[in-house]
Design a protein with these regions (language model features):
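N-terminal auxiliary "cap/dimerization" subdomain that precedes the catalytic jelly-roll/cupin core
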Residues: 1-73, 80, 185, 222-235
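Catalytic core of Fe(II)/2-oxoglutarate
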Residues: 150, 156-235
Length: 235
């Protein structure tokens, strides 16, 4: 896979990100995802989440994320969102959901980071509609938080929608989008203004579901809402 060609039109895609709040990137089907998913799955074992595993970091390095994407996102963060931190403020985590996992579904939330990228690594097949844990997201669901207090209040207020019924209600007044990732195109969106969650990975799925979640630039202080929530969740 030619990584330079992969990022060839990133400037125009990032224009869409700023304009619409989200953008899809080119497919990763040319990458050896089967080998990658096997490596990551072995590293993770029974874990649902694992931060910056060896195979995960190797993938990010192979894709040259910090050469082709991070500097451009950093520029947007500074100029469009008045970000004052540094470009190393990143959080990379693998998420593996086994078929029938009843916990990892409809947990709607905002991220604390400015940008979130969902990278599909292994997407299972399911005979049932929305049965393979696809992403549900609402771009521009809230305004950019101006401080930690507004960030906390916004997160707390939207927790009432963290259920299937709540999401159905929220979608009556907000644009809902869904992404199965069967095309293996990563999705990049504004993390702290996009309410997002996942459908369930049903027991009938052909395999586990594995994605990489890349988070860029948390504008909150070191012990802000996002950091504390990650500490509580132990990840």
């Amino acid at each position: 896979m030619n990584t330079k060609e992969y990022w060839n039109d990133i400037d125009s895609r990032l224009e869409q990100l700023v304009k619409y709040g989200f953008v899809k990137l080119p497919s990763l089907k040319e990458y050896d995802l089967d080998r990658l998913s096997n490596q990551v799955s072995i590293e993770m074992g029974a874990l649902t989440f694992k931060e910056s595993g060896i195979a995960h970091k190797n993938f990010l390095n192979n894709l040259n994320i910090n050469e082709y994407l991070t500097p451009k996102l950093f520029n947007i963060a500074q100029n469009a969102f008045n970000y004052k931190g540094d470009s190393l403020n990143q959080y990379h985590i693998a998420r593996k959901v086994e078929p029938g996992n009843s916990k990892e579904m409809y947990r709607a939330h905002f991220d604390s980071h400015l940008f979130t990228m969902v990278i599909p690594v292994k997407i299972p097949e399911s005979a049932e509609e929305n049965g393979s844990g696809g992403l549900i997201y609402f771009p521009n669901a809230r305004k950019m938080p101006s401080n930690e207090i507004s960030n906390f209040i916004g997160k707390a207020f939207h927790k009432k929608y963290a259920s299937k019924e709540g999401l159905d209600k929220f979608s009556n007044a907000h644009e809902k989008k869904e992404e199965s990732f069967m095309d293996y195109q990563p999705l990049l969106f504004i993390g702290n203004t996009t309410l997002h969650t996942n459908h369930a990975v049903l027991s009938s799925c052909s395999s586990y579901r594995l994605t990489f979640l890349a988070h860029f630039f948390d504008p909150s202080p070191k012990y802000g809402v996002g950091s504390l929530l990650r500490l509580i969740r132990n990840r």
